[in-house]
A protein has these predicted regions:
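Conserved, single-site charged/polar hotspot
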Residues: 1-367
């Protein structure tokens, strides 16, 4: 038993201090919590490794909190801990494979899940779509999630983590949503990424476009040739293709940080049919706001896209729109319908990301 414990500690210690290698390039670091004062951990055989290489054997349940600029465990302060276990570790209500790294950042806990990229992807599938969808659409999701993660790993090299586990990057719910179809979609596309001129692309995607995907230049200002808008008649069958929302002007005043809001008018639309600007009529004059900023300020789950109309009546604004998300790149519901129509995942990807090429991640690729 002591020899086994020593072996486990040695393996974990290597994970802390080993130089960058092909194996490490297969790992992804995901921030699963960035604002908590404490987290509850549960797992069998949990070990906490200090930066010195010394290990602390943890009970099956433990609480880690922040205090005096350190992370606190059983009354002792640490700068950073790496925690491993015999199986997944539950963090509050969700379980995670791999290693957890905990540190204090700006008075709160930063919890990072470090695990093999392919394991991470299995946890992404059912967080972003449903593995019950046609397998070719599941495979397409696996490839773009892998590509997105690899591109972020390059972009954020040297940062504490590569990705957030939220819509700020792509949603990742740990191991709880894993299933055999999600694993199959990842396994049958193992290592495949979308590239442009030999480099992984910025593989943006969204729920449903409302009939036309958007140019990246209209959203972020960067015109990428593989993120040009395309027509997408398939997403008309999507779950959130059209939407309506009624909001009081007082609520909008708070969200938009304006006073005396009396009317909302629409500015010009771009070539893809989405609004460029929104005009806010207030008691102090007219405020012109970029439509994307307006959407994010009110809430991206409330105003689901920048393709909408609005009327103001009796102190409320009534919105009607189509699409859900920024509209750039792959339309998830459109991809589902294309798969139902017999398109392969590679055909789906080449349609939404024109000019790209599928390539296999290689140990000497540098990414």
């Amino acid at each position: 038993m002591n020899k086994l414990l020593f072996l486990i500690i040695a393996i974990v210690a290597l994970g802390w201090s080993a130089p960058v290698s092909a194996v490490e390039r297969d790992l992804i670091r995901v921030a699963i919590s960035r604002a908590a004062d404490s987290v509850n951990l549960q797992g069998d055989g949990m070990l906490a490794l200090r930066e010195t290489g010394m290990a602390v054997v943890l009970p099956p349940a433990a609480t880690v909190s922040v205090g005096h600029g350190q992370i606190m465990l059983d009354g002792t302060g640490y700068r950073r801990l790496r925690i491993t276990a015999a199986g997944p570790i539950k963090v509050n209500t969700k379980s995670y494979r791999g290693v957890l790294e905990l540190s204090a950042s700006n008075g709160v806990l930063l919890v990072i899940n470090e695990l093999p990229l392919e394991d991470y992807l299995v946890g992404v599938i059912n967080s972003e779509i449903s593995s019950t969808w046609p397998m070719e659409s599941v495979k397409a999701q696996a490839v773009i999630a892998r590509t997105y993660a690899v591109a972020k790993r390059i972009e954020r090299h040297g940062s504490p983590y590569h990705l957030e586990a939220t819509v700020m990057d792509q949603v990742y719910s740990g191991s709880d949503l894993e299933d055999s179809r999600a694993a199959r979609g990842v396994h049958e596309t193992a290592g495949q990424v979308l590239t442009y001129h030999g480099k992984p692309i910025q593989a943006f995607y969204h729920a449903t476009c409302g009939g036309k995907t958007e140019d990246s230049s209209h959203v972020w200002g960067a015109a990428l040739p593989y993120l040009k808008g395309v027509d997408c008649q398939y997403c008309a069958l999507g779950n959130s293709n059209t939407w309506e929302q009624a909001l009081s002007l007082s609520r909008l005043e708070t969200a938009l940080k304006v006073a005396g809001l009396t009317d909302i008018r629409l500015g010009p639309r771009n070539s893809r049919g989405r609004l460029k600007t929104v005009l806010l009529s207030t008691s102090h004059g007219t405020v012109t706001m970029p439509a994307t900023k307006f959407r994010m300020a009110v809430g991206s789950t409330v105003i689901k896209s920048t393709n909408f109309t609005v009327r103001v009546d009796d102190g409320s604004a009534y919105f009607s729109g189509s699409g859900y998300g920024h509209g750039v790149g792959l339309c998830q519901w459109g991809a589902k319908q294309r798969a139902l129509d017999g398109f392969s995942y590679s055909e789906i990807l080449s349609y939404y990301y024109p000019g790209t090429e599928l390539r296999i991640l290689a140990p000497d690729a540098g990414f």
